[in-house]
A protein has these predicted regions:
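Short helix-capping/linker segments at secondary-structure and domain boundaries
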Residues: 21, 79-80
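General marker for long, soluble alpha-helical cores
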Residues: 2, 66-74, 80-85
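N-terminal acidic leader/helix
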Residues: 4-29
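A short, ordered amphipathic alpha-helix with a cationic face
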Residues: 2-4, 23-25, 35-41
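Amphipathic, hydrophobic secondary-structure cores in small proteins
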Residues: 29-74
């Protein structure tokens, strides 16, 4: 089983690589679908590689996107924890 923080890391990398944009005003279902599609399309390692490339090529844009991604994943985790309680 993947540890919670590792799962969040995988989800962050996958969501970073997805086509989902802040302007989409993503719902939790949209986030889950984007994560699944990115993992299917690129694989876990591919998502990490693509993300690293973006940070190398466009560090400011990548940092901004990662802040947004981490916010979405944190909200997703909080919602899941509340539902489990």
């Amino acid at each position: 089983m993947i540890a919670h923080h590792d799962r969040n890391g995988v989800c962050c990398r996958a969501l970073f690589c997805s086509a989902l944009q802040p302007s989409d005003a993503p719902t939790p279902d949209m986030v889950a679908t984007a994560i699944s599609r990115a993992i299917q399309q690129f694989g876990i390692g591919g998502c990490a590689s693509w993300m690293a490339q973006e940070f190398g090529d466009h560090p400011d844009a990548a940092a901004s996107r990662m802040r947004w991604v981490r916010q979405l994943i944190a909200q997703r985790s909080a919602t899941r924890q509340q539902a489990a309680a």
